[in-house]
Amino acid sequence: MLRLIYYLALAAAPAAAQTQDARFFDERVAPIIERHCLGCHNEELKNANISFVDRESLLHGGTRGPAIIPGNPARSLLIAALRHEGELQMPPGPPLSKKDISVVTAWIKRGAVWGTRLHKETTPQK
Ligand code: HEC
């Protein structure tokens, strides 16, 4: 019996981590994207041919190629843009707060797990 419980716990662990990461996205990351990025990168406008409404769009990326490499923020174009490290600086104008940048960085490091808050039907906030 104990052994059964042990195996059940093992099987449940990855699912729990996934849920936790999805919640991290919905509560911490999605609000940043909604507020600062979605106005220009949505299904209608697609600035630089990239929309931020789902994970696939970011993995596929825009005219420059993939915007995020899950697990590897240092090689993710999106992070370089947020940090104003290169020619591409996002959002245009003043950079995000250090805290917001670290939240997005942590999210990519943890595998860039998506939640339910942003999807194809999400419309940008006016
Ligand atoms: C005011 C409109 C606007 C906002 C807000 C904005 N972007 Fe952009 N974004 C653009 C434009 C325009 C380009 C194309 C720039 C270029 O090609 O030089 C672009 C390009 C990009 C690219 C490169 C895509 C590619 O493959 O060429 C990334 C990544 C990106 N933005 C991320 C973001 C992120 C992350 C945010 C939010 C923090 C954001 N953008 C907010 C207008 C915007």
Regions found by a protein language model. Give the residues of each.
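Sec-dependent N-terminal signal peptides
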Residues: 4-13
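Aromatic- and Gly/Pro-enriched helix-to-coil junctions and flexible linker segments
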Residues: 15-126
